[in-house]
Each structure stands twice: as C-alpha cells, then as structure tokens.
Swiss-Prot record:
GO terms for biological process: cellular response to hypoxia; complement receptor mediated signaling pathway; fibroblast activation; negative regulation of angiogenesis; negative regulation of blood vessel endothelial cell migration; negative regulation of cell population proliferation; negative regulation of cell-cell adhesion mediated by cadherin; negative regulation of cytokine production. It comes from Homo sapiens (Human). One of its GO terms (molecular function) is R-SMAD binding. It comes from the Eukaryota. Detected in brain, heart and liver (at protein level). Highly expressed in liver, skeletal muscle, kidney and pancreas. Detected at lower levels in heart, brain and placenta. Detected in aorta endothelial cells. Overexpressed in colon, breast, prostate, bladder, lung, and ovarian cancer tissues. InterPro entries: RGCC. Keywords: Cell cycle, Cytoplasm, Cytoskeleton, Nucleus, Phosphoprotein. Modulates the activity of cell cycle-specific kinases. Enhances CDK1 activity. May contribute to the regulation of the cell cycle. May inhibit growth of glioma cells by promoting arrest of mitotic progression at the G2/M transition. Fibrogenic factor contributing to the pathogenesis of renal fibrosis through fibroblast activation. Interacts with SMAD3. Interacts with CDK1 and PLK1. This is Regulator of cell cycle RGCC. Residues 65-80 have a biased composition (Low complexity). The modification Phosphothreonine is found at residue 111. Residues 1-20, 57-80 are annotated as: Disordered. One of its GO terms (cellular component) is cytoplasm.
Length: 137
C-alpha cells in the first residue's frame, strides 16, 4: 500500500520522495507527469488520442530491424545476433544448432543425444513401480 503522501498527483509524490535534490525531483516529477498523460491518453477513445502509438511502434520495429552500421564497424544486425546468442531465452533448436561463433568442440564421431518426443520408457517404468507401491499400501 502506498503511503498517504505518495497518493495523488505526481508532483506530490516527487515532493514526498526523501532526500532528492531539486533536479532529480523535477526529473521524477516530469517523468510521472508524462506517464500520467500517456495513461490518460490510453484511457481516451481511440479517435481522440493525442499520439498514434501504433505508428510509433511500427516505426521503432522497422528501425530496430534495419541493418545500419555505426562508427564501431559493427552493424545492428551483428549486434542483435550476438545479443540473441548470449540470451537465456533460446529455444531448443537454437541451443542445439551451431552458430558461426561456436567453436568446433565436438568431433564428427561424437554427436549429442536428443530426447525424442515419445521417449518415455524410464518415466513409464517409474510410474508403474509407483502404482505397484501404492496398490500394496
């Protein structure tokens, strides 16, 4: 639950924040006012909105997917690939497929085993054993 001083206007919340210097309090107040304005805009009917969020979102998607080189010599797509490879949100296919940056650690004769969708013999045996144990109780 929010303290009573933090409820109400964004300016009151910024003023109630302890030990903020005036610049930080002003920045916080500005951010909270902008946030309130966006929420109010979303609450209004679609045709009365002040900003076209869908167009902005599409423009940002196009910008982020475009391959534009910066001064570092790396393109955005190369940066995105390395970020994608270092992410924890891989699918099994991405984890088990080699990439250009993956060192060739596995020899051609050693291939990792993948579990198959119908490969449940150990689980079935465990469940059958559990059923027998429960039946004997």
């Amino acid at each position: 639950m929010k303290p009573p001083a933090a409820q109400g206007s964004p300016a009151a919340a910024a003023a109630a924040a302890p030990a903020l210097d005036s610049a930080a309090a002003e920045d916080l107040s500005d951010a909270l006012c902008e946030f309130d304005a966006v929420l109010a805009d979303f609450a209004s009917p679609f045709h009365e909105r002040h900003f076209h969020y869908e167009e902005h979102l599409e423009r940002m998607k196009r910008r982020s997917s475009a391959s534009v080189s910066d001064s570092s010599g790396f393109s955005d797509s190369e940066s995105a690939d390395s970020l994608y490879r270092n992410s924890f949100s891989f699918s099994d296919e991405k984890l088990n497929s080699p990439t250009d940056s993956t060192p060739a650690l596995l020899s051609a004769t050693v291939t990792p085993q993948k579990a198959k969708l119908g490969d449940t013999k150990e689980l079935e045996a465990f469940i059958a054993d559990l059923d027998k144990t429960l039946a004997s109780m």
